[in-house]
Design a protein with these regions (language model features):
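Charge-patterned, long linear interaction tracts outside catalytic cores
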Residues: 93-156
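Mg2+-dependent endonuclease catalytic cores in nucleic-acid-processing enzymes, primarily RNase H-like
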Residues: 1-113, 157-170
Length: 170
């Protein structure tokens, strides 16, 4: 796992052009773009290029596939990311990753579904928006597993029947 770029303070068209350059150099199976707020312009721009079939819109507040387990798509993606990290995916040794991944709290909504802490609440606790964490989580929002080879987990996870892992990274 490696970070290919971090873009801040550029317009949506420039971001789309940077994404196209990365698509051409890295040849990904899918490109997941945050389609909330300013990201919608980037999605629109990418949908007009030759790589449009690779582009998947991510709506963080959208409906989860299993809304009994996850309050929204963001919670669903973070839960999928947690499972992948538990299975052994390695991240760069960088304190920014740790801050983003460990700073986000979670709880349960009134229906018992996993719900992540809102970004304004994180800000009130003195934490920045978890941009790296959200970006990584979005990569688990699209199922491209059929085209990828996932390495076997070297250490089995002991989960008792009926027990669910419900901590992100702690």
């Amino acid at each position: 796992m490696r970070l290919l770029g971090l873009y801040r303070g550029i317009d949506t068209v420039e971001l789309a052009h940077n994404a196209i350059a990365l698509i051409e150099s890295e040849k990904p199976a899918a490109v997941v773009v945050d389609a909330t707020g300013l990201g919608v312009g980037t999605v629109d721009e990418l949908k007009h290029c030759v790589y449009r079939r690779l582009v998947h819109e991510f709506m963080a507040g959208g409906k989860a596939m299993n809304n009994n387990k996850h309050a929204n798509k963001r919670a669903e993606a973070w839960d999928a990311m947690r499972a992948a990290l538990t299975a052994g995916i390695e991240l760069p040794d960088d304190p920014d990753w740790e801050t983003d991944l460990c700073g986000t709290e979670f709880g349960f909504n009134n229906k018992g579904a996993i719900q992540l802490e809102r970004k304004d609440m994180m800000k009130s606790r003195g934490l920045p928006s978890p941009d790296l964490g959200d970006s990584l989580a979005m990569t688990f929002a699209v199922n491209v597993a059929s085209s990828l080879r996932i390495p076997a987990v070297s250490t089995p996870i002991n989960v008792q029947p009926g027990q669910e892992l419900n901590r992100w990274m702690r």
